Curated annotation (Swiss-Prot):
Gene Ontology CC terms, in alphabetical order: endospore-forming forespore
Gene: sspO
Record-stated family: Belongs to the SspO family.
Region (Disordered): 1-23
Native organism: Bacillus velezensis (strain DSM 23117 / BGSC 10A6 / LMG 26770 / FZB42)
InterPro entries, sorted: SASP_SspO (IPR012613)
Keyword Zinc-finger: no
Pfam families: SspO
Induction annotation: Expressed only in the forespore compartment of sporulating cells.
GO biological process: asexual sporulation; sporulation resulting in formation of a cellular spore
Xref: HAMAP family: SspO
Record's protein name: Small, acid-soluble spore protein O
Alphabetic keyword roster: Sporulation
């Protein structure tokens, strides 16, 4: 039997293009968070 490509496969699905360069990192190192924003960040990380 000949292997056929499935119709539902989308080309490039395994490429991480949507994440872009440096995904997940803050590029601006001088970004200063207030104490309240730091607490919020900790809460968000535990929920993910």
């Amino acid at each position: 039997m000949v292997k056929r490509k499935a119709n539902h496969v989308i080309n490039g699905m395994n490429d991480a293009k949507s994440q872009g360069k440096g995904a997940g990192y803050i590029e601006n190192d001088q970004l200063v968070l207030t104490e309240e924003e730091r607490q919020n960040n900790k809460k968000r990380k535990t929920n993910q």
